[in-house]
Amino acid sequence: RMEPVDSLERNAETGRFLVRTPSAAYDAAAVIVSAGAQPRKAGFVGEERYAGHGVSYCATCDGMFYRGKQVFVIGGGNSAAEEALFLTRFASKVTVVVRKDHLRAQASVVSELERSEKVELRLMTSIVELGGGELPSSITFRDNATGETHVETYEEGSFGVFVLVGRVPESGLLRGLVELDESGYAVTDE
């Protein structure tokens, strides 16, 4: 039987757990939590509106939908850099948008990006808005050094935006039960 969990409590005296679901409460000696993590949002205007319709959070899942199209990858870490390289298999052009003046990814991956003819790096840049109709057709960029913005327009549906800025753990049920780090991940000994 599978149900969503509403709450998880631990009895301080017995050490046992009480798991509450919409239909019942279960007493357990141990609980295994495998809630995973959700993609972190970039926070630009239009991100939610176009999620699944021009905005994606997984290059290996959705990259093939952008065969022959331009894609923008938001992020400067290893995942963003590696997925940007993966997207060069499908996309006509991959523009990596990094809010800082450098990528945090491993030097070897950054070097590969810099050597690729399909990749453009836009450092000190953020996407602040995605606009359009049913599918996106414009991107507003901000120069993070000057604060100036400019809009680039494209044919509707001719590009995609991949948001690869980290993940947020689904650890809400664990708050107060186990030690969590500043990002919300359970602290373990290994």
Feature roles, as predicted:
Residues 33-34, 73, 159, 163-164:
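Redox-cofactor binding/interface segments in oxidoreductases and associated redox assembly factors
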Residues 75-77:
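Glycine-rich Rossmann-fold phosphate-binding loop(s) that bind the pyrophosphate
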Residues 84-85:
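Generic hydrophobic/aromatic pocket-lining and core-packing "Φ" positions
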Residues 29-30, 53, 68-70:
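Nucleotide donor/acceptor-binding cores
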Residues 38, 43, 49-65, 164-190:
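FAD-site-proximal beta/loop scaffold in flavoenzymes
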Residues 80-81:
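N-terminal Rossmann-fold NAD(P) dinucleotide-binding loop
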Residues 3-21, 25-28, 89-189:
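A Rossmann-like FAD-binding core segment of flavoenzymes
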